[in-house]
Amino acid sequence: MASGVTVNDEVIKVFNDMKVRKSSTPEEIKKRKKAVLFCLSDDKKQIIVEEAKQILVGDIGDTVEDPYTAFVKLLPLNDCRYALYDATYETKESKKEDLVFIFWAPESAPLKSKMIYASSKDAIKKKFTGIKHEWQVNGLDDIKDRSTLGEKLGGNVVVSLEGKPL
């Protein structure tokens, strides 16, 4: 069921900036987004970038010790969100980076919010071409343990996420 919600151009720009890893100067790399949240506009007609709900690569090691833990703390406990998380992980063979699309729909969110976010998910997913990993999360217990994301990324072959062993 489509909700009629549209995706703001800024959301698409953020996705494209996160997806394309072109050679960049150290300053440009620091400005790259590691994680970003998207929400519905106040009139519930557009999916927009949620201001101040992001982690930049340059924040890691400076104001952000562990990007995964910091990302989990950005999620509102009583409302839905969409998120992109640029996961850096290691398998037994190699280091990898993949974008993960997350649909955050906590049990404590209002039913109306869960319904409109669920029915609008396809609109944003269609704009995020090439996403390999999608994850619907319904509460902190599902997301706070990094090993759950490790399983989503590669089953039992992932040995570390963001430099931390699983």
Swiss-Prot record:
Subcellular location: Nucleus matrix; Cytoplasm, Cytoskeleton
Family statement: Belongs to the actin-binding proteins ADF family.
Gene that specifies this protein: CFL2
Protein function: Controls reversibly actin polymerization and depolymerization in a pH-sensitive manner. It has the ability to bind G- and F-actin in a 1:1 ratio of cofilin to actin. It is the major component of intranuclear and cytoplasmic actin rods.
Tissue: Widely distributed in various tissues.
Residues covered by the ADF-H domain: 4-153
Keyword Phosphoprotein belongs to the record: yes
Position of sequence motif Nuclear localization signal: 30-34
Entry comment on modification after translation: The phosphorylation of Ser-24 may prevent recognition of the nuclear localization signal.
Name the record gives this protein: Cofilin-2
Keyword tags: Actin-binding, Cytoplasm, Cytoskeleton, Nucleus, Phosphoprotein
GO MF annotations, alphabetized: actin filament binding
Keyword Glycoprotein: no
